[in-house]
């Protein structure tokens, strides 16, 4: 199986399955001298771990991380950083009766067509549990970016038909982790919670939208043509399971605008070139403008629902009916928030190292003033 490595100058390779012994990540390209502890990574993993509220799966996992290599006396060494999280609460018996059944909306059929076999327990490699490895890698990326004044924050802006009002970065920081749906608009959060509860009570699920905002990214990050910053962000976010669309800045709404509405006029602010508005989402021509980078990921409803659905037995070819049991998220949107943060952080740190804005050898050699 290929496609398990992400990035160029700062690379992560994830491994593990939902019901295997554990999952983890190997990071290559992190500079030496970055202060890093298991607590740094654990803080990020705790944001996505299951069983924290009624809107997530009730699978109980502590998701305790172990750093196996690449860190000595609290500092990265410049060698590969390996991290492992062991599974503790897998219940594979719930999948035994559907081991040969293609679950609608899942990767089962595609895996069988490509590989001729699959780990049917909890989706195996295609499970959303794989994203904990991305969050662990993103934790290191975020720690490195923080030395350069770059922060990445995400929040839920829609669940089902409930939309949040626009939020400032201060509101996002202050409110997102105060509610189980990870919404910065606390009044909308209550309505979103009701939307998720209604879907669960109807043996159904619901999707939504996560918005990610990166601040402090200097102008000049990204390259023209195929490795445009926005192209890389879209690629990274589309790689998250369940994401079906990505927007940058005004996104799809820009198709209905005139140029006079869409264009962000330039101005100077504290001696630096800025734009009066930010409909471009902080990126023009594939290169950052110095304004906040804003992107959104649309996430489909969780495909695991307990309603009867038509499907096919992949062993016999016979049509059949499936009713999925087990522990599943009625909405994966809230737990996608830290995953989206991680993927955006990984893109930005990779591009900043590639572009010479972060020292690729030593994190101690930081001249952060050049990037602010």
UniProtKB/Swiss-Prot annotation:
Catalytically driven reaction(s): 5-O-(1-carboxyvinyl)-3-phosphoshikimate = chorismate + phosphate
Record-listed FMN binding positions: 125-127, 285, 300-304, 327
Spans through the membrane: none
InterPro entries membership: Chorismate_synth, Chorismate_synth_AroC_sf, Chorismate_synthase_CS
UniProt superkingdom: Archaea
EC numbers on record: 4.2.3.5
Molecular function GO labels: chorismate synthase activity; FMN binding
Gene Ontology biological-process annotations: amino acid biosynthetic process; aromatic amino acid family biosynthetic process; chorismate biosynthetic process
Pathway: Metabolic intermediate biosynthesis; chorismate biosynthesis; chorismate from D-erythrose 4-phosphate and phosphoenolpyruvate: step 7/7
Any one GO CC term of the record: cytosol
Residue sites binding NADP(+) per the record: 48
Co-factor requirement: FMNH2
Coiled-coil region list: none
Keywords tagged on the record: Amino-acid biosynthesis, Aromatic amino acid biosynthesis, FAD, Flavoprotein, FMN, Lyase, NADP
Gene3D superfamilies, A to Z: Chorismate synthase AroC (3.60.150.10)
Entry similarity comment: Belongs to the chorismate synthase family.
Biological role: This reaction introduces a second double bond into the aromatic ring system.
HAMAP family, A to Z: Chorismate_synth
The protein's name in its UniProt record: Chorismate synthase
